[in-house]
């Protein structure tokens, strides 16, 4: 597994890509800000306007555009770029897909996907509020074609295909964004990973957070002085090296609490903590609940 695979795993992602919106006439659809959820709009036909909370001017969107809100920022899609009254769509089921129709005719058609994730997911928290891409990217073109094919008529195994597409779609969106020629806007762990001097160390810690990551070992892995390492981590990642290691250990611990029957002590030791008490205190500081309560409530705090 590479670092993107690991971050996807630690994010505890779940998702759906089974909503198709058909918009026509004088339409306006409001999406409120979501907590620990990302949202993707994929415009497959037509055009309209996107009004994003906090921005003063509407953005035109059209066929081929993909708009990704990693943290579910509130926004309005409309026919004229104005904040009109949000219409209640007519909803019907078309096989696996839920079809939402607003207005008469068809000015814009789009697929919508949603992703839930752990509140400390570096994968989503390190991205900008809005990511703009286009279906023209070869890999994205492929997965969008799959959505269109499965929505047109029920095929054998459609449910399995549609259920598998959200995670594929998200990884391809992330890959396409990170591969852009221009400088991408990142923060936190993602920014540190892209840093030429820190990237190797960050990848090693994420790969094996349970190892003994003392400052001397990290200095050697990054090939820089202790002072340089401290400054660069703070400026790029926003954490000290030690805090970063604990941050990743706790995310892995949260994942194991959710996915395995291991005791809290076993989880604590397997992610690099020396005792259940130390792990429990650190976990509660980050997740605001005890490890046992986190497991009981099903995670994604």
Swiss-Prot record:
A Gene Ontology molecular function term of the record: sequence-specific DNA binding
UniProt effect for mutating residue 231 to L: Decreases DNA binding
InterPro entries to which the protein is assigned, alphabetical: AraC_lig (IPR032783), AraC_XylS_family_regulators (IPR050204), Homeodomain-like_sf (IPR009057), HTH_AraC (IPR018060), RmlC-like_jellyroll (IPR014710), RmlC_Cupin_sf (IPR011051), Tscrpt_reg_AraC-type_HTH (IPR020449)
Coiled-coil portions: none
Impact reported for residue 281 to L: Decreases DNA binding
Domain HTH araC/xylS-type as annotated: residue spans: 196-297
DNA-binding region extent: 216-237, 264-287
Activity: how regulated: The affinity for the mtrCDE promoter increases 2-fold in the presence of TX-100, a known effector and substrate of the MtrCDE pump.
Keywords recorded for this protein, A-Z: Activator, DNA-binding, Transcription, Transcription regulation
One Pfam family cited in the UniProt record for this chain: HTH_18
Miscellaneous information on this protein: The MtrA and MtrR-binding sites are sterically close and addition of an effector increases the affinity of MtrA for the mtrCDE promoter such that MtrR binding is negatively impacted.
PANTHER family given in the database record: HTH-TYPE TRANSCRIPTIONAL ACTIVATOR RHAS, HTH-TYPE TRANSCRIPTIONAL ACTIVATOR RHAS-RELATED
Function: Involved in the induction of the mtrCDE-encoded efflux pump. Binds specifically to the mtrCDE promoter region.
UniProt name for this protein: HTH-type transcriptional regulator MtrA
Organism: Neisseria gonorrhoeae
